[in-house]
């Protein structure tokens, strides 16, 4: 019998956290007063979690960052990094979970990707009871990785 293996936590990052994090990098040194920037730095430097996203989420990231006048080179580099390092999903639509229809892609991605967490600055938009994913604010400890579904099903046999 094989021993179940844990995995890195899997998470979805709301656009609000990405924007707040990037603003922390603009000022140079990432300070402890910007937990969104710390989350991004930790993911870039230490791969602290598996970032889950979809094409729809990538499009939103890109549109919001451009609207906020983040340099095109910065936006391009970030999108390329996410395409290379994150797990890109095609979740489809889940139905109405969030009170904000713009947040539905994040909910659908979290559910389809078996996310351990969804990190946001707007927790009211992501009702904890409607999601199987833990909703976190930046700076809260990330949950530890769970057993993979494949390994969990092996254990039950």
For the regions a language model picked out, list residue spans one by one.
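Short, well-structured N-terminal submotif of metal-dependent ribonuclease cores
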Residues: 1-51
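Short secondary-structure boundary segments
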Residues: 15, 55, 121-123
């Amino acid at each position: 019998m094989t021993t179940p293996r844990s995995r890195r936590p899997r998470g979805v990052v709301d656009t609000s956290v990405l924007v707040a994090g990037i603003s922390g990098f603009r000022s140079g040194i990432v300070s402890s007063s910007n937990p969104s920037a710390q989350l991004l730095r930790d993911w870039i430097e230490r791969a602290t979690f598996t970032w889950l996203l979809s094409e729809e989420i990538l499009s939103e990231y890109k549109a919001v960052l451009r609207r906020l006048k983040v340099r095109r080179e910065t936006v391009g580099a970030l999108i390329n990094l996410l395409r290379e390092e994150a797990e890109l999903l095609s979740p489809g639509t889940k139905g109405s979970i969030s009170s904000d229809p713009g947040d539905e892609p994040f909910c659908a991605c979290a559910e389809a990707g078996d996310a351990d967490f969804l990190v946001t600055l707007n927790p009211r938009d992501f009702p904890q009871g409607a999601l199987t994913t833990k909703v976190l604010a930046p700076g809260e400890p990330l949950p530890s990785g769970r057993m993979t579904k494949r390994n969990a099903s092996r254990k039950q046999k």
